[in-house]
């Protein structure tokens, strides 16, 4: 069995004008594809070849396998966290975010601060941990499942996620990203 690059759940231009077609083509077809291809090369002919991405992330057989499996999973999840469909958060989700962070806008502010303030490459996440919602950032390929957390939403803060559109302005990227968050998908993760 080999791992496959999942198709985007929307057309390459579906997130415009917030995230460009060019960014999605490079990000998905080059960066994400590279992680999948490297992972296949690393696990070919080993007992790891028949495991799921989740198993490889949780078991972390080698650092190289972990990094590529986590990046493959993180990206597949990231694509689902976005849509060009203008989905708004439900009252139920807003209530949970309000209980945890003081309101939807307060959640977005705290998440943005964590994402923009992250030093270097990585990810910003909304996770469920011990029954509570938390905002965390992880470095490089680190996936929260490694620490027993359940991912609900993620934003890729590696520069390749935004450099074509906003150059080195991560804050501008986050401002655009909020316009394409797929709140329905987030709620389905709860």
UniProtKB/Swiss-Prot annotation:
Family of this protein: Belongs to the iron/manganese superoxide dismutase family.
Key words of the record:
Iron, Metal-binding, Oxidoreductase
Record's Pfam families?
Sod_Fe_C, Sod_Fe_N
Named cofactor requirement(s): Fe cation
Write down the species.
Entamoeba histolytica (strain ATCC 30459 / HM-1:IMSS / ABRM)
Q: Which domain of life is it from?
A: Eukaryota
How is this protein organized at the quaternary level?
Homodimer.
What EC number is given for this enzyme?
A: 1.15.1.1
The record's cofactor note says: Binds 1 Fe cation per subunit.
Impact upon substituting residue 94 to T: In strain: SAW 142
Per the entry, what this protein does is: Destroys superoxide anion radicals which are normally produced within the cells and which are toxic to biological systems.
Checking SUPFAM superfamilies in the record gives: Fe,Mn superoxide dismutase (SOD), C-terminal domain, Fe,Mn superoxide dismutase (SOD), N-terminal domain
Q: Which GO terms describe its molecular function?
A: metal ion binding; superoxide dismutase activity
This chain belongs to the protein called Superoxide dismutase [Fe]
Residues binding Fe cation, per UniProt: 27, 75, 156, 160
Q: Which InterPro entries match?
A: Mn/Fe_SOD (IPR001189), Mn/Fe_SOD_BS (IPR019833), Mn/Fe_SOD_C (IPR019832), Mn/Fe_SOD_N (IPR019831), Mn/Fe_SOD_N_sf (IPR036324), SOD_C_sf (IPR036314)
Q: Which reaction does it catalyse?
A: 2 superoxide + 2 H(+) = H2O2 + O2
